[in-house]
Amino acid sequence: MSLIPSLSLLLMSMVAASYSETVTCEDAQKTCPAVIACSSPGINGFPGKDGRDGTKGEKGEPGQGLRGLQGPPGKLGPPGNPGPSGSPGPKGQKGDPGKSPDCDSSLAVSERKALQTEMARIKKWLTFSLGKQVGNKFFLTNGEMMTFEKVKALCVKFQASVATPRNAAENRAIQNLIKEEAFMGITDEKTEGQFVDLTGNRLTYTNWNEGEPNNAGSDEDCVLLLKNGLWNDVPCSSSHLAVCEFPI
């Protein structure tokens, strides 16, 4: 029987302790029976367990990282197209008058006359030793025997043409020049039997030998001046004396 009061007292102490956190001592004295006694607050307990994760939040704005270091310069690009021409610059100042060398007109005239005299002397020497002159033509031979094609090439090389007599005087001049039969600038290569000069013009003077031209062998397309001054048709591939005609 002595244990009952002790158990009742212990139970009331536990009830009073459970209200100590929310009920002040003064309130307890007003509302609780006289047997309830106030005590000091108890020691805090251990932290509770973590609660559950909350709902997923909205996506935040992108962050901004730190600016990196400046890289090395890149390679040079290809050159661009040329730009448009610029506007002309201002006109320059007028230059000083130039200086011309002193000319002695009398000396120039005397030198020109001396040159003309020398050229005339050389022409006379050539005429006497190698060629013949008739009017404004000068006939010259190198004394070589060659085909008609080579004779043409030789005369062209010296800005001349193959000798072609236009009258009896020119025919006689060539005859007096040669010591062998010589080619003349006359052919019928384009039209058989129609002899023309090397410019294609028909002849106004001829001096054919008796029975010529006869086209013997069907290939006599070139013309020779014989040593007696008469003409004869022969093959152009044969070799005869070269005589060139120079205008003067």
UniProtKB/Swiss-Prot annotation:
GO terms for biological process: complement activation, classical pathway; complement activation, lectin pathway. Keywords: Calcium, Coiled coil, Collagen, Complement activation lectin pathway, Complement pathway, Disulfide bond, Hydroxylation, Immunity, Innate immunity, Lectin, Mannose-binding, Repeat, Secreted, Signal. Residues 75-87 have a biased composition (Pro residues). SMART domains: CLECT. The modification 4-hydroxyproline is found at residues 47, 73, 79, 82, 88. Pfam families: Collagen, Lectin_C. Residues 112-130 form a coiled coil. Residues 134-245 form the C-type lectin domain. GO terms for cellular component: collagen trimer; extracellular space; multivesicular body. It comes from the Eukaryota. SUPFAM superfamilies: C-type lectin-like, Triple coiled coil domain of C-type lectins. It is found in: Secreted. Residues 43-107 are annotated as: Disordered. Residues 1-20 form the signal peptide. InterPro entries: C-type_lectin-like, C-type_lectin-like/link_sf, C-type_lectin_CS, Ca-dependent_lectin, Collagen, Collectin_CTLD, CTDL_fold. One of its GO terms (molecular function) is D-mannose binding. Residues 42-99 form the Collagen-like domain. The keyword Secreted applies. Residues 49-61, 93-102 have a biased composition (Basic and acidic residues). Calcium-dependent lectin involved in innate immune defense. Binds mannose, fucose and N-acetylglucosamine on different microorganisms and activates the lectin complement pathway. Binds to late apoptotic cells, as well as to apoptotic blebs and to necrotic cells, but not to early apoptotic cells, facilitating their uptake by macrophages. Oligomeric complex of 3 or more homotrimers. Interacts with MASP1 and MASP2. Interacts with MEP1A and MEP1B and may inhibit their catalytic activity. This is Mannose-binding protein C. The gene is MBL2.
